[in-house]
């Protein structure tokens, strides 16, 4: 795992929607041959998402390299999307963004993180499990395949 130059994180706003879409499409393109279609994050409305969710952008110097999209509920923080540019995958940025999500949840008084992923995204499932997420249940996905519901209890929250 090579070290990246200086990393900074900032909240996305409406002017960032195109960059969010571009990074997400690049990050998820690897899964098209695996599932035979574009994954749902590649089709999302990011103009709407930057208004309704918290999307934090991770930069290496001045280059956008990763992002995390979350929203708060009454009892947990839901991770809608994590995307890391293909050339920066495997460098620990996903782990860093998951820790960032834990901090957000704690700051909001929440003790649980939740997310969904496609069972075919085996490397992602393993990543989430490696940082303490557990599989709560699986269910058939309306577009084919299997959706994996995962959660992680965190210390310092109320849930």
Predicted regions and their residues:
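Active-site acidic-Proline motif in GNAT/NAT acetyltransferases
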Residues: 85-91, 119-120
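Conserved GNAT acetyl-CoA-binding A-motif
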Residues: 105-117
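Conserved beta-strand-loop-alpha-helix junction that forms the acyl-donor binding cleft
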Residues: 115-124, 141-146
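Conserved active-site tyrosine of GNAT-family acetyltransferases
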Residues: 128, 133
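Acetyl-CoA-dependent GNAT
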Residues: 7, 11-87, 95-104, 135-143, ...
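Terminal substrate-recognition subdomain of acyl/acetyltransferases
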Residues: 2, 146-159
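Intrinsically disordered, low-complexity, positively biased terminal segments
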Residues: 110-111, 134, 159
């Amino acid at each position: 795992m090579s070290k990246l130059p200086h990393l900074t994180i900032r909240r996305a706003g409406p002017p960032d929607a195109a960059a969010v879409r571009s990074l997400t499409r690049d990050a998820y393109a690897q899964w098209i041959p695996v599932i035979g279609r574009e994954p749902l994050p590649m089709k999302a409305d990011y103009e709407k998402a930057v208004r309704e969710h918290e999307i934090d952008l991770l930069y290496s110097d001045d280059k956008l390299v990763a992002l995390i999209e979350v929203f708060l509920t009454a009892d947990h923080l839901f991770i809608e999307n994590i995307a890391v540019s293909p050339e920066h995958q495997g460098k620990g940025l996903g782990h860093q963004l998951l820790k960032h999500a834990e901090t957000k949840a704690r700051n909001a008084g929440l003790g649980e993180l939740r997310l969904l992923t496609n069972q075919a995204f085996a490397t992602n499932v393993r990543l989430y499990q490696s940082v303490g997420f557990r599989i709560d249940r699986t269910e058939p996905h309306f577009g084919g395949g299997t959706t994996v519901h995962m959660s992680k209890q965190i210390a310092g929250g109320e849930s």
